Amino acid sequence: MPIQRPFNLNQWINEHRHLLKPPVGNQCAYDAEDFIVMVVGGPNSRKDYHWDEGEEFFYQLEGDITVKIQEDGKAVDVPIREGEIFLLPPRVPHNPVRGANTVGLVIERKRRNGEVDGLLWFCENCNEKLYEEYFVLEDITTQFQGVFKRFYGNEDLRTCKNCGSVMSPPSIVN
């Protein structure tokens, strides 16, 4: 199999910019044997936190984003400014919040056999965990959507047992 040659990332982004918007927002630049190399654009409006067993590398190319993480039982905002890099450790619940006109490079390791991904939601008022679901990731489009539908379609799951707040579904970003 021929080895993919270097290419100009800025040119690639400009040629694919129309695809770096909702509802998908990301495109694979390399789908290699061990790594997934994605270019991700904003805006997004997700409220879930993603959990996986591998590290994720962020390089923010255009604009600033915030990666919300759960650290020592607290919600923490990690700003990543244009030109900055950030290596997220494995097994850290995280939610990258991307504004309009932002573009970043995200690299993550492909899942090993038996590894699981998870989606978690935390109360926006008191940070109590509302719901979590773990699964072996086979198809990100269908599996994530199924979990989203289960969570957002059930007000009991969205209601905080600690403070009674009800999480509303995220606004749709077009």
Predicted regions and their residues:
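Jelly-roll (double-stranded beta-helix
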Residues: 1-59, 64-85, 93-174
